Amino acid sequence: MTLITPSKWLADLTRQSFLKEYPVEVHYNTIDTSIFKPTPSDFRERYGLQNKIIVLGVANVWEDRKGLFDFYKLAQMLDDRYAIVLVGLSEKQIKDLPKNIKGIQRTNSPQELAAIYTAADVLVNPSVEETFGMTPVEAQACGTPSIVYEDTACEEVALQNGNTVVPQDVNALYEAITGYKFNGGGNK
């Protein structure tokens, strides 16, 4: 039996587990680049974010391990040039958001998600548990750079694509976000 993992990070963990006697191969997950590509939209206009630097977070289910509360902290730290947009929140989570975070439940299609990635200036993925992490790959395909935490598979994916990896600390995220040179104050 050969074990297949979606990242070297998970392969290394597997080799340290009770499964270590089995060979392990890495096969990266892929995305559909006919969908995840630069996709023009009216997203900025629809949400009144024309002159903002959009800091995007995307998750299927938002919880602490996905970095939701790091976005709450970032909302207190970033000035009004920035707009945090989170996709994938529940209705309750949206109701509980700080006023300076825009929450979106789900997208209606992968194409809509690609348009949001394209509209964003940077994707932030502060997850502390990822076996691969599709969002940085999808964002990159749409022309949007990513900032991810180290010590997860996201680090491996981000480094291969020239993105930014920071220690698992909200202050490091803040420094990376504010250190980016955005064209035109938020319009890519």
Report each predicted region and the residues it spans.
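Nucleotide-activated donor-binding/catalytic signature segment of Leloir-type glycosyltransferases, i.e.
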Residues: 88-111
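A short helix/loop element that forms part of the nucleotide-sugar donor recognition site in Leloir-type
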Residues: 37-48
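Conserved acidic donor-binding segment of nucleotide-sugar-dependent glycosyltransferases
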Residues: 163-170, 178-184
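Aromatic "clamp/platform" in nucleotide-sugar-dependent glycosyltransferases that forms part
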Residues: 128
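Short hydrophobic beta-strand element within catalytic cores of glycosyltransferases
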Residues: 145-148
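Short alpha-helical donor nucleotide-sugar binding micro-motif in glycosyltransferases
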Residues: 115-120
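Conserved donor-binding/catalytic core segment of Leloir-type glycosyltransferases
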Residues: 48-66, 72-76
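Carbohydrate-associated surface elements
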Residues: 9, 30
